[in-house]
Curated annotation (Swiss-Prot):
Species whose genome carries this gene: Prochlorococcus marinus subsp. pastoris (strain CCMP1986 / NIES-2087 / MED4)
SUPFAM superfamilies from the UniProt entry: Radical SAM enzymes
Compartment list: Cytoplasm
Cofactor note: Binds 2 [4Fe-4S] clusters. One cluster is coordinated with 3 cysteines and an exchangeable S-adenosyl-L-methionine.
SMART domains with a match to the protein in the record: Elp3
Lineage: Bacteria, Bacillati, Cyanobacteriota, Cyanophyceae, Synechococcales
Protein name per Swiss-Prot or TrEMBL: Ribosomal protein uS12 methylthiotransferase RimO
Annotated GO CC locations: cytosol
């Protein structure tokens, strides 16, 4: 990044690097902190070795994420870096962290990342800083500086922050606060800015995207938002974290009628059995799962369906698990993520009886993965012999183009790997769309040949 503030050019300032753990919501926070520091004249990047201040933006959703965050904190403090801990762990353990890890120089909560420059200035003066609000309330809009890596051609656009649901297994409402939506004008403005920077795909995110607008408009307003975003000149707009309750006829119609909103439905259903869903404090969902999935497939035959599931939830027995397997066979999702229940202190599920033994939960996870691999392979093989549109994101050492069609989301799904007969300079492909013929498919990826650039 370049320094924007010429007034600080001659000052001795910190070189700040970022280490990021966790979800894309955390990534957006990191990008805003980078943008804010850049505006203040700091040298900002990802080169830990060259930096004297390292901001570790942490995740605290499950134990493994906390362990990874702690490892990074220890690694960087051992290197003599001034470490500032931001994000969900700072919010979760705002009192304990500074006591148990006195080598940490500062904390920045999930609703306080806009204060990062002030925090670093105080750390530079030798202060130990705890900048963590009790209840996160802030959400950045398009006016808050943000560094977006244009080399990736994909950007996440946060439409709301926080969550008002109280799912039994989830700590996020305590870490991210209540839902607070941005207004439609703000979101559209940022989308236009991203499109002007050459972003080819915008992914809408929040804790529950289908609840967007409930807090500011008095009712869920995703359909209104999508109607306005469909006018933005960006090839692909993708929606993550859509819950069944918010997939109204109007929302589904927005997918169907738009040219740039891809028919990709990310539905974190977690389970299928009514008893388990009730224990998860999602009793409303069981009656909707079947009807919503059928409705999507009927109205949008080209729809791609992804879900995430939890196995080993307290009280889940073989009957419940078999119900889930039957559900998967019946609906044949294109993509499935499966996780083993992680008991998190501070959630209502933490004290639930009838814990599932770890070896049983592991076996159930493996069972689902095996079943889904067969389904995904069958689904992918339907593309063999067809022509598809692919966004090229990188080039392999073998001069193969690697990208995605609309049915693959970045990071979590597969890739499309393409050979090309007359290879030219990579700048002719990266960040551009090509038309490709698919020749082969496995359970994860598609393989084919480039027909032409688009």
């Amino acid at each position: 990044m370049k320094q924007n503030n010429q007034n600080v050019k001659d000052k001795k300032i910190s070189k700040v690097a970022f280490s990021h753990v966790g979800c894309e919501k955390n990534l957006v926070d990191t990008e805003h902190m980078q943008g804010l520091l850049d505006k203040e004249g700091y040298e900002v990047g990802n080169d830990i070795e060259d930096a004297n201040v390292v901001v570790v933006n942490t995740c605290s959703f499950i134990e493994t994420a906390r362990e990874e965050s702690i490892r990074k904190i220890i690694e960087f403090t051992d290197q003599g870096k001034e470490v500032i801990v931001a994000g969900c762990m700072a919010q979760h353990f705002k009192e304990e962290l500074l006591k148990e890890m006195p080598e940490i120089k500062g904390l920045v909560g999930t609703g306080d990342y806009q204060k990062i420059a002030k925090v670093i200035k105080r750390v530079e003066k030798g202060e130990i800083v705890n900048e963590v609000s009790k209840i996160p309330e802030f959400i950045a809009d398009e006016k808050i500086p943000r560094f977006v890596d244009k080399n990736k051609f994909v950007a996440y656009l946060r439409i709301a922050e926080g969550c008002d649901y109280k799912c039994a297994f989830c700590i996020i409402p305590k870490l991210r606060g209540p839902q607070r939506s941005r207004d439609i004008e703000s979101i559209v403005s940022e989308a236009k800015n991203l499109a002007a920077q050459g972003i080819q795909e915008i992914i809408l995110i929040s804790q529950i995207t289908t609840n967007y607008g409930q807090d500011i408009y008095g009712k869920p307003s995703l359909a209104r938002l999508l109607k306005e975003l469909s006018k933005v000149s960006v090839p692909w707009i993708r929606i993550h974290y859509a819950y069944p309750t918010g997939l109204t006829d109007e929302v589904i119609k927005s997918f169907k009628d738009s040219n740039n909103i891809v028919p990709y439905f990310d539905l974190p259903l977690q389970h299928s059995h009514p008893d388990v869903l009730k224990s998860m404090n999602r009793p409303w969902q069981a009656s909707l799962n079947e009807s919503i999935l059928s409705q999507i497939r009927e109205q949008i035959p080209s729809a791609v369906l992804r879900t995430s599931l939890i196995v080993g939830f307290p009280g889940e027995n073989q009957k419940h698990f078999q119900h889930l397997l039957d559900f998967l066979h019946r609906h044949e999702f294109d993509h499935v993520g499966v996780f083993i229940f992680s008991p998190e202190e501070g959630t209502s599920a933490f004290d639930l009886p009838n814990r599932v033994p770890s070896e049983v939960a592991d076996a159930r996870k493996d069972n689902i993965i095996s079943i889904q691999q067969n389904i995904s392979k069958k689904k992918n093989q339907l593309y063999v012999g067809t022509t598809i549109k692919v966004l090229v994101e990188k080039i392999s050492e073998n001069k193969e183009l690697i990208g995605r069609s609309y049915n693959f989301a970045p990071e979590i799904d597969g890739n499309v790997i393409l050979s090309i007969k007359n290879y030219e300079d990579e700048k002719n492909y990266i960040g551009k769309f090509v038309e490709a013929n698919i020749c082969f498919a496995d359970e994860y990826d598609l393989y084919g040949e480039v027909i032409k650039t688009l």
